[in-house]
Amino acid sequence: MQMYLVSSLLVALLSTAFESSIDRAFTAANMNDWQDAASALDEAFTQDPQTFDANNLHYLRGRIAENQTEWLRAREEFNKIGADNPLHSLAVWHALRASVQLHDEASAAQFLGALPREFPAELKMRIAREAGPPLTVKIYEDLSTREARLEQAKLQNDIRSMRDLFREKKDDDVALEAARLFSPHVLTPLDQIDVAQVFAAHRQFEQALPFYEKASADPAHAAVARYETARVYFWLQDYKSAVEMYRAIAKDFQGTNWQKDAEYQIALVYWKMADYHNSETAFLDYIRKYGPAGNKEAAIRNLVDVYRVLGEYRKGVETIDRALLTPLSPVTRQVLLFTKAKILYSEDRYAAASAIFQQLRQMKLRSAAGAATAEEAAYFQALSQSKLGNQAAAEAIWRKLALDEFSYYGQRAAEKLGRTETVVTSTAACLPAENLTVAVEADLASLRHPLRSEISRSSDLVSELVFLRLWDEAAFWMERLGATRIPPRGAAGIAYLAGRYNRSIFYADRLPKTGATLPLLYPAGYGQTICDAAMAQNVDPVWLHAIIWQESRYNPNARSGAAARGLMQFIPETAQAVAASAGMSEVTLDKLYDPAISIQLGAKYWSTLLDQLNSPEMALAAYNGGPDNVEKWRSKALDPELFVADIGFTETKKYVLAVFAVRAAYASLLK
């Protein structure tokens, strides 16, 4: 009996020591202290080899060795994961990577052959980028992704395949690189147009221009090539050349849609040049000439804006009133009514303006450039009533709007009611998020299995990775395997701990908005980098978080249709200009995907815009829509109250409203 008690006590002590070593390993790994993590795991293996093996801790030991660049030890540990283990295919991939780092080509080829054919292409591509030519070629041959096809075409100098790639799709990075490599081999006018379109899609306008010009010499492609040439001049802000080209197109292609479209563009270019009288004449000529057969409704809207900039409000109202007597689409009718109300408000005709704002509130409002939102119509009706001295009526509307503390007009209404915003200091915004990390890990405890004495054959890959707290791989495979067994709350937590903040936002957006879930929906990702950049530029880091959230949802690999890249979504020419002003080295397209560089550029640009415009609304509009457009929008009315309502791009207006809402959410979390 005494011997049994001694034996039981020894087992308990060993078990306690083992668990203590494992806890130390997890803590050290979480702090990136790889040496201490490795030491703790080695102790645990000595204390209880069977339990160590049963809980897949050899896999964790291999990952630790990888971080120490101890590739031989890493491969040894991954080789201990058996074929019937749910982590086997991952272990094979890691052993393959270790073999590549060790320049052991024979072993690497063997491990590559052992990978399942359906193993994720992006992980195979990572090996290809690190491996030597024989293995690289083999990987590319077995993959059909655009990235693999491009790399294979580069290795084989396969010009035809490069052309196929950018003809299939023009707006991704593969297309741009393929077009660059193909451009010296352009053979036909169609090739020239295709290459030019790729460069233009990526805002490489100076590279696009010579290809369009060459293609325009071919009669079969002259119209499209010359029209696109004019567009390139426009984007390069060479407005004089753009007008000349559009005029030549209108003359040489009379009676066609090319003429009609060119004449509309001429009016827009004059507007962009601030040559408002010529713009007025061009829009009037266009409307008279083409009527409903042309882009009449848009021309009328633009013509009214010209009158507003010129201060010719009477002409603007008369143009609107005439148009309202004709058949119009519902959205154009709403836009014109809203514009008329803003003109009347600018003329201090508050009663007439209020009546139209009330009329708009009773409509089913649609989203469009220049259209009102329901909140906007209510806010301006209240503003009109306030100007008329009907303060009670105004405050009743503002109180309703202020119930939504996150919305832009809710915030403005609260200001009108005398409520002051709680200021969040930069220090508060820069506090470390360790408490949140601990809370999220605790929340995931139910997904982690307890220590076991033998491997469970029913376990799945993601569960094993969650137990090992390998959040990066758990987040990756959770989505690849469609791990529906993990609820959105757990999935958001795993993604957050993995630093995949865009996926944390994706899952948290499905959850009730509570104190526990809001930090997952509005993560303070890249916190220290953002705080350092904010302090260097003397800007509020909360604004930077809000801009990143709206621009990319914290996805460092985000790319927009307008060729903007990275966390803070810079287009190439803006990035180069900001980098030069900040004294940074040349920023290549690849560098725009680097979070640190994107944040550094974003903080500098945001600081510059705030200094220039002295208004967060205008600075946000400039960030999204361009500073030159902000000048056009602000010139429509002297009253700054009207600026957001006068933003001419639907996307930019939504952007400004959204960033204010997101900033309020971040501020509420930091109170």
Language-model-detected regions and their locations in the chain:
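Catalytic glycan-binding domains that act on GlcNAc-containing polysaccharides
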Residues: 237, 276, 301, 310-315, ...
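"A position-specific structural signal for the A-helix of alpha-solenoid helical repeats
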Residues: 23, 60, 94, 126, ...
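Short solvent-exposed coil/turn linkers within tandem alpha-helical repeat scaffolds
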Residues: 45-54, 78-90, 112-128, 140-145, ...
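Alpha-helical segment of the N-proximal tetratricopeptide repeat
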Residues: 20-43, 47, 67, 148-152, ...
